[in-house]
Regions:
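C-terminal membrane module of polytopic membrane proteins
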Residues: 117-150
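Hydrophobic alpha-helical transmembrane segments
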Residues: 33, 37, 69-74, 89-90, ...
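Membrane-interface helix caps and helix-loop-helix hairpins in membrane proteins
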Residues: 81-87
Length: 150
């Protein structure tokens, strides 16, 4: 949440939005009975196995573990790019930096999977509990009241 809200504000200022195709994809996944399984459980495990367990670990070995920030940034950029749209890129990139740093500190994906799960679960829960936020506008978090927002 600490990165999501400021980035969402920046997206609104720059008028960066998700494409309609991506919005429809999310709505169909979130609306299905297996949506949480896919986004809340399977995605964190699969993405951590690929991006930290395989890509970051390989890059770390290539750089002989001497320059950890280069592999962390490269894997985070790939993680952001794989999310497929500018509206998710920055959030995924920042999350990828954090998860990469955690992997470098622990040499395990377990903590990364847990943090990734929490992140996706919070997003899923907000989507389900606050349908007015489904358009991604911060004003909806404050029930349309500009005074509460600023």
């Amino acid at each position: 949440m600490g990165a999501i809200l400021p980035l969402q504000w920046l997206y609104e200022q720059l008028n960066i939005t998700m494409s309609e195709d991506v919005k429809h994809l999310f709505e169909s996944i979130m609306g299905s009975s297996w949506g949480y399984l896919a986004l809340g459980i399977l995605a964190p495990v699969a993405e951590e196995l690929v991006f930290r367990g395989a890509i970051l670990r390989s890059l770390m070995a290539y750089f002989n573990y001497r320059l950890p920030w280069i592999p962390i940034v490269v894997s985070a950029l790939l993680f952001g790019a794989v999310h497929g749209n500018m509206a998710q890129f920055a959030n995924a990139f920042v999350m990828g930096l954090l998860l990469g740093w955690l992997y470098c500190r622990t040499h395990s994906i377990v903590l990364g999977v847990a943090l990734h799960w929490v992140n996706n679960t919070v997003a899923y829960t907000m989507y389900k509990l606050m349908p007015e936020m489904n358009d991604g506008q911060l004003i909806d978090l404050f029930h349309g009241d500009n005074k509460l927002m600023y």
